[in-house]
């Protein structure tokens, strides 16, 4: 399936609109996220590997904020446990439609994959079934901060003993010098991947009001407040990280 290069912010815009996951973003999203998030392919593939350690027979696995289903595809590649099913959820109609296309293509290429259901829904209003694994891959940062604990508490209540939440997020840092350094290194990463200064600046203006990162300390405190017993960072590249939270 063809993928377009990300040129959404390549031309000067008189007014930069807030970032939304619309059809324009969907067309370039695979290229955008690979060139913008250091370590993204490693995170996605290893979520599948980690899932194989926590998924339990005859349970549901959730990919919340599934976007185009990269994590869902990784779960289906790596989890070989009887009776598991993946539910991929996103609130963007354009994302859901393209995600379904990608998963149909995966079905055509491979046999004996986990069954999957793709749902267009607000994850804050989703009725979660008992589950052995939930993934939030760069999703929580788009949830209103005042509702993040509520969502994590509901996930914790749905998790079965021995299950896990895998949470990946962009981080901010309490130490100003550390935050500035890692922000500069992230900009260098984007430059190295072909983004111009104009593209970087306009994308920042578009996303800074809708994506609100937390610090690692905030994530840990919130997860513990939601009822998780242990929080283990398993990956970090620059200001992007992934955690495993255990019930």
Swiss-Prot record:
It is an enzyme of class 2 (transferase). It catalyses: prephenate + S-adenosyl-L-methionine = carboxy-S-adenosyl-L-methionine + 3-phenylpyruvate + H2O. Keywords: S-adenosyl-L-methionine, Transferase. Its EC number is 2.1.3.-. GO terms for molecular function: carboxyl- or carbamoyltransferase activity; S-adenosyl-L-methionine binding. S-adenosyl-L-methionine binds at residues 40, 65-67, 90-91, 122-123, 137, 204. InterPro entries: CmoA (IPR005271), Methyltransf_25 (IPR041698), SAM-dependent_MTases_sf (IPR029063). Pfam families: Methyltransf_25 (PF13649). One of its GO terms (biological process) is tRNA wobble uridine modification. Disulfide bonds: none annotated. It comes from the Bacteria. PANTHER family: CARBOXY-S-ADENOSYL-L-METHIONINE SYNTHASE (PTHR43861:SF2), TRANS-ACONITATE 2-METHYLTRANSFERASE-RELATED (PTHR43861). Catalyzes the conversion of S-adenosyl-L-methionine (SAM) to carboxy-S-adenosyl-L-methionine (Cx-SAM). Homodimer. Belongs to the class I-like SAM-binding methyltransferase superfamily. Cx-SAM synthase family. HAMAP family: Cx_SAM_synthase. This is Carboxy-S-adenosyl-L-methionine synthase. It comes from Ectopseudomonas mendocina (strain ymp) (Pseudomonas mendocina). The lineage of its organism: Bacteria, Pseudomonadati, Pseudomonadota, Gammaproteobacteria, Pseudomonadales.
């Amino acid at each position: 399936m063809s993928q377009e290069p990300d040129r959404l912010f390549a031309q000067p815009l008189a007014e930069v609109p807030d970032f939304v996951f619309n059809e324009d973003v969907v067309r370039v999203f695979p290229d955008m996220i690979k060139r913008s998030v250091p370590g993204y392919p490693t995170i996605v593939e290893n979520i599948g590997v980690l899932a194989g350690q926590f998924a339990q027979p005859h349970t549901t696995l959730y990919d919340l904020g599934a976007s185009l289903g990269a994590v869902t595809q990784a779960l289906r590649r790596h989890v070989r446990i009887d009776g598991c099913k993946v539910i991929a959820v996103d609130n963007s109609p354009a994302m859901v439609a393209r995600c379904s296309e990608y998963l149909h293509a995966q079905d055509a290429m491979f046999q004996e994959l986990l069954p999957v259901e793709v749902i267009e829904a607000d994850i804050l209003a989703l009725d979660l079934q008992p589950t052995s694994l939930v993934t939030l891959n760069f999703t929580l940062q788009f949830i209103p901060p005042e509702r993040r604990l509520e969502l994590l508490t509901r996930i914790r209540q749905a998790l079965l003993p021995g299950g896990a939440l895998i949470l990946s997020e962009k981080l901010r840092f309490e130490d100003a010098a550390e935050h500035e350094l890692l922000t500069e290194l992230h900009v260098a990463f984007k430059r190295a991947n072909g983004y111009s200064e104009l593209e970087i600046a306009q994308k920042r203006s578009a996303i800074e009001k809708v994506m609100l990162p937390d610090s690692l300390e905030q994530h840990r405190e919130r997860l513990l407040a939601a009822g998780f017993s242990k929080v283990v960072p398993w990956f970090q590249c620059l200001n992007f990280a992934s955690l495993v939270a255990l019930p």
